[in-house]
């Protein structure tokens, strides 16, 4: 038996439960069908065969889940941060224990190759560990002094939140959104994408088996137009974290406006990789190929526009074309596969249509550009490179979200910057140059939320993740995640410094509450009393008291 056959047999054993019992919603710790009994079918992009029947939640199901999240919120928010930390680490341990199952199910549900999905499960565990370690300090604030005033800030969880996750790398991206929400003390209603619902089900059951209380994490499957909309409009849901298309993000903002929803969006991208003639061309080519063709090109941070200095354009694109042609397209469970099938026939059709658009616009196909007859007859598309393109072409302006790279030449630094910024998106950028001064100058003006210099996308969890323009609102990562899931509260103590002699080092009884008086270096009393205008010991007014209100 080959390694591929062995992996397929394992995958079938992991998927058997879904084929037999389907995928139910999980609300308040219970498996439940949709309120009206509706279902939909999820298929594998490998062979287009059904994987499971999935409960199709709608407004009634979202309402039930939101009420469960609301009921669980007070106790979960009140749990000490150290206790939440321990529980989130238990969830991470449980993810690691089931990492193979998660990876194999994700491969068959999304078409992503095992080469990358084996790591994605472990990255999901690391997301939980990272935010678990920060849970005890999540509420910590600052002490801010002003003349006559001390301000103390703290943070409190915002309440029940909605999490809407995409079909690309759904397990890892779900952990990226859910782990900080739980660490902050929020309860959640999670609606995964309908194209890839299976690992979301694994994740919620892993969390509850690790000890997460009922109602803290609720899962409702369904379509965007019913379950998604009901979630974004529900009055008990205080915020929405969403990863997906920019157009959908705009719709969510409109739907949440009546209830003044806080929103955090990670949206589309048309990210440039800018290669100057002085760059290490071989390293830059490897990085460009990795950032567009890994994960099937179905990633928000993919470098889908290749901007190359004219003097090395032909040489560099030839290197990239040769590397693209050598990429193995195949079954996602084959250990050698880099590019597997695209997630769904609907998406495959979109990608193939864009390839035809590029050809009709006059761009040259230097590699790929065709449907591949892969194992199982699924949604396979070859790694594609367009050369001879310009920035006005649709393939250079619109997000394709597949293994399609568009290469455009530039004259000089100013031209490169103008081309890089001339799109509606601004998620990431990649810059390759040996000139450090140029790198600082260029990144200062590149319109992107994240930029990597002489590197592919290498994430460091404490750093901010997010885009500008049509690529998103807000930042994930580090403390930025807590800023979204928590409200900041300020408490101001107003006082005034006194210089008169009297009761130095004594104790005033103010309204029955003791307030100690200390001495400053000039011999005058300095204190913060707890009330204004009350009598002190022996009926005398306290020397120091709260200042008059402003």
Language-model features: locations:
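Hydrophobic face of amphipathic alpha-helices that form TPR/SEL1-like repeat modules
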Residues: 1-45
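Short, well-ordered beta-strand elements within core beta-sheets of diverse protein domains
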Residues: 50-57, 72-78, 162-163, 273-276, ...
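Alpha-helix boundary/capping motif
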Residues: 521, 533-535, 541, 545-549
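Conserved C-terminal structural/oligomerization subdomain of aldehyde/semialdehyde dehydrogenase
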Residues: 49-53, 237, 274, 328-329, ...
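ALDH superfamily catalytic-core signature
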Residues: 239, 247-390, 414, 453, ...
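Rossmann-like NAD(P) dinucleotide-binding subdomain of oxidoreductase/dehydrogenase enzymes
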Residues: 96, 139-283, 410
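Glycine-rich loop-to-alpha-helix module at the N-terminal edge of alpha/beta enzyme cores
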Residues: 49-138, 148
